Design a protein with these regions (language model features):
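Bacterial Sec-dependent N-terminal signal peptides
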Residues: 1-23
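Thiol-based oxidoreductase modules, predominantly thioredoxin-like and allied folds used
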Residues: 22-27, 47, 64-88
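A short beta-strand-turn-helix
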Residues: 24-43
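Short active-site neighborhood of thiol/selenol oxidoreductases, capturing the structured segment around
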Residues: 39-52, 315
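Loop/turn elements at helix/coil->beta-strand transitions in domains of secreted/extracellular proteins
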Residues: 39-43, 73-78, 101, 109-112
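Conserved redox-active cysteine motifs that mediate thiol-disulfide chemistry
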Residues: 49-62
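Non-catalytic, surface beta->alpha helical segment in thiol-disulfide oxidoreductase systems
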Residues: 63, 98-142
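Oxidative protein folding and maturation machinery
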Residues: 148-360
Length: 360
């Protein structure tokens, strides 16, 4: 009993003390869970940023009496700022990711994630999501079983896809969004709802909606903020290329990424450079040294590689090529690289050593 009393006093001292509204704790998330166990409550963790305008829009909502009464009665409430050590200490070990801010995470007192919410800044939405967190069947942690049982409503799929993003279940997110894209009319891909879907939920450049975005880029730029459209399209392409899925891409798929980058206004030189390593590594894995040479020649002849670029590529050929047919081309690359440095520089010495390896 004494322990519960002391925890309550400590919570009061650490809380955001307001006459009404949600009482948030700060700075010690472990203390929040200790208090939750003592009071047999769940924990709401709001992940936010001090520089986030959408986060700031929730401030007056948090201060509403009805909101405060509900959350203070049912939850221990904690605010986690994304720039603090709480992210590394709490979210990262649990493999939790914040794809959008603010993010509302509801945990049981043993730190098990039960519910996820990304919502508009209204009291009704905040109260509704809190009530869902208190209702076991409504929690996002139970959505997989509901999906397995056949539930397929649009809003349900959206919530499940976001939950998958938060818990880093990329494979399930891709499956869900492929299903949604297949049943959605193509003519609706660029409407406001699906633009939000593309922005917030898609993780795969191979999704039909992602391909539509790339191939109809001008349509989206006309309807929505051009900078946001470019950011979303570029992120889809690059995150897919350098994901675990991207590591399994064949040459044609990598070339599609390169073409996609050009379509959205990334310069041809930059698109060439960004896709070089994945493509030549694919050729190395297939023992296609000739194609790796040709792709590298394309890069060197059409971009402006620096000395560091030459050193890396030359070293990579020495490490990964399965035959010595690349040696004549490598000699040519070394000679080009040497024009970018002084004869006896450390870089020149490294390049000459790499050439000697290739010629053995």
């Amino acid at each position: 009993m004494k322990k519960v009393y002391l925890l309550a006093i400590l919570a009061f001292l650490c809380a955001d003390a307001t006459a009404q509204g949600i009482n948030f704790l700060y700075n010690d998330i472990r203390q929040a869970f200790n208090l939750a166990r003592a009071q047999r409550k769940m924990v709401l963790v709001e992940v936010y940023s001090k520089s986030c305008e959408h986060c700031a829009a929730f401030e007056p909502v948090f201060k509403e009496k009805a909101v405060g009464d509900f959350y203070n009665q049912n939850f221990i409430n904690y605010r986690l700022e994304v720039s603090t050590q709480d992210v590394q200490r709490f979210l990262t070990p649990k493999k939790l990711f914040a794809p959008s801010l603010p993010l509302f995470l509801f945990f049981d007192s043993n730190e098990n994630l039960q519910h996820v919410a990304i919502i508009n800044s209204t009291a009704s939405e905040l109260l509704r999501k809190g009530q869902e967190a208190l209702t076991p069947n409504a929690r996002t942690s139970n959505f997989r079983s509901r999906y397995a049982a056949g539930e397929r409503g649009d809003n349900f799929l959206f919530d499940l896809a976001m939950y998958c993003r938060v818990v880093c279940d990329t494979a399930f997110n891709i499956k869900i969004m492929q299903e949604y894209a297949r049943r959605t009319p193509v003519a609706a891909y660029s409407d406001k709802t699906n633009w939000l879907v593309i922005q917030k939920l898609l993780m795969d450049a191979d999704n039909p909606m992602a391909k539509y975005l790339i191939n109809n880029y001008s349509v989206f730029k006309t309807k929505y903020n051009p900078n946001e459209v470019k950011f979303v399209a570029e992120n889809l392409l690059m995150s897919s290329l350098y994901s675990s899925r991207g590591a399994r891409y064949d040459a044609a798929q990598i070339q599609q990424i390169r073409q996609g980058l050009v379509k959205i206004g990334i310069g041809t030189e930059s698109a060439n450079a960004r896709t070089l390593l994945p493509e030549i590594n694919y050729y190395f894995s297939k023992k296609q040294t000739d194609k790796a040479i040709a792709r590298t020649e394309d890069y060197i002849n059409n971009t402006k590689p620096q000395i560091a670029d030459y050193k890396y590529i030359i070293g990579l050929f020495n490490q990964r090529a399965t035959d010595k047919t690349y040696a004549p081309a490598l000699k040519k690359w070394v000679n080009k690289a040497l024009t970018l440095t002084t004869p006896n520089s450390p870089d020149a010495q490294i390049l000459k050593q790499e050439l000697a390896k290739a010629q053995r």
